[in-house]
Amino acid sequence: MTTESTDGIATIVQGEDRTLTLWATDEKGNPFSLTGNTEIVVKLPGTTSAIERKKTDGQVTVVSADAGKFQCTLTAANTAAMKSGSKQSFQAEVTFASGKRIIVFDSVLTVKKAPV
């Protein structure tokens, strides 16, 4: 399932497969170009350590480099290991030949426990 949130909050249920569609923006809210990136690592809150998904491992895909749009695929095992809670933050580290940029997605993730 792909998540494209209209309210800015992505909701994930632990133990389900998910694909998050994300847009990187600069400080002014303009699209942050992903053109020329060599790696994108998405780091999500886990119960014991961060859940990392990488472009070079095929877990992150650039959809539109100019628009800053990319997707992060999460397996059921990934979401089961995520920390439950509301309005959590996570980040994406985008690496270019010239250096690394960290994009923070602040208070936009809710992870719920699966109903019994």
Per-segment meaning from a language model:
Residues 1-116:
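Contiguous segments within soluble domain cores/interaction surfaces
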